[in-house]
Amino acid sequence: MITQNNANIFEIEQFAKDGKHIPIDPGAVFKFRIDKNTYLTEKRFLSGRELLEIAGKIPPENFRIDMIIHGGRPRKIGLAEKVDLAEFGVERFVTMPLDPTEG
C-alpha cells in the first residue's frame, strides 16, 4: 500500500528541476505527473501503455504519451517502451489524442 507519509517517496519532477539523481532504493515510491494529475507507483519501470492506462487514456492505442526531460525536448514513448522513472532528468509526461489517421 502506498501512503503519502512514506519517507521513501521521490517526486521525480522536483529531482529533475533541482538537477539531482533519484537514489536507487528498493523501497522507493515514485511520484510523477501525467498532464495535470499526480500519481504514485512502487514500480520504477513503466511502459507507455501502463502510463496511459494510469492516466485513464483508454484505449491506449488512441493516445500518444511524451516524456518531458528537464531542459530538453519532449520525447515520444512507444506503447511497449519502458521508461525508467529514476532516470536523471525525467520530469513529467504529457498525453494527447491521436488523429484517427495517426498510429
Predicted regions and their residues:
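Ubiquitin-like/PB1-type beta-grasp interaction modules and other compact soluble beta-rich domains
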Residues: 1-103
